[in-house]
Amino acid sequence: MSQTITLPVTGRLTIKQYNADGVLIDERNINNVVVDSGKQHIRDRVLGSGSISGATGVMSYMSIGYGTGGGQTSTALVNEVGTRVGATGAASSTNAILYYGSFGSSNPSGATGITEAGLFNTITGSTGIMLARTTFSVINKGTADTLAITWTITIG
């Protein structure tokens, strides 16, 4: 007799926008979707099998963009802008991982309305696996502004 155990994988992020003087001008707390490819990546890492993209397959990059489409089956942001940034990950409890990333001045190179963010295992947009994605109402990021993102992935 086999037994099936279901562990939900959920995500939540906090986005803080700072102006050029370091003053907090916006803060958002947003739930997100852990996409199918992200769940499959977790499965493959546990099994030690599957095709793992990236140097080690570790989720360690964040990206921002503009777009509202996509969902559970998404594998990329709708319109990624700027350069992906390194996301430092650390265990925060027995079942959660915290990622920290920051999009500083000139990333992207001009003022942009940001409406989506993603968590990936590679620095380039054309390869790799997306773990999680979220959309939100527009954050108008000025060229000199910084977006600081704290992303929590919880299993179980």
Locations of regions flagged by a protein language model:
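Small cysteine-rich, disulfide-bonded extracellular modules of the LU/uPAR three-finger superfamily
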Residues: 1-115, 122-156
